[in-house]
Amino acid sequence: MYRLLAMKRFFIKYMVAVLLIMVAAKAIAQPKAVQDSLAKANTLYATGEYDKAAQLYEAILLKGFESKELYYNLGNACYKSNQITKSIINYERALKLSPKDEDALYNLAIAKKMIVDNIETLPEPGFLRWWKDMIAALTTDQWATRSVVAFLFFLGLFGLFLFTTKAGIKKLSFWFSLLFLVYSIFTFSFASSQKSRLTGSDKAVITERSLSVKGSPSETGTELFIIHEGLTVQITDQLGEWIEIRIADGNKGWVKENSMVKI
């Protein structure tokens, strides 16, 4: 009886955690007014009025609505109106929501050819790249759904293990329940990772025309190197108004927070 009560409490806590992740990740349905604004912005873009289209896309974002398509369209409008840095920011935001989107990846690569800095990227370890790709293969909701389904299978099989008297079934149900539990835990962690990636800000785009990167979080810090507008950097630490960044070649330093836009 005690084991059943403990399982029930564990199940409730687990389901609440999974549902919270799913609710937090669920996109807000677009009301008709937003759909109309989006259609108008798309029409403006199609007729070559890129500045007006960009303004309308931004107005939709200010209302609290976002999607990969919206950021991608805004990136295109900014690029067409020669706002290269803003186009990079929005392509990066589109890729944050959909890391494998080929159109956004291609257009981002084109936009980055227009900026001053061309920094060679350090190769990422194969296993780490594979791990990130695996997590990014599904959305937060999809991972969370798999976690719930696997956990339900675990409960059913573990219940069978507890109550069956047949040795063969008892053994099989135990090992299969363990397998589903492990899968459920992994998929839950993948859902959590996806949620953290979507809600966190560990990347930024430099908005200063030319920026001195310091060796310490101070105006009097030693100048390490110079970077320029449009460069995407990794945020590694923050101390007040100073942010420690890492660029693609691995070099690190400190810059002011107001010199960048977080992704």
Set out the residue ranges of the language-model regions.
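Beta-loop motif signature
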Residues: 46, 199, 206-235, 239-240
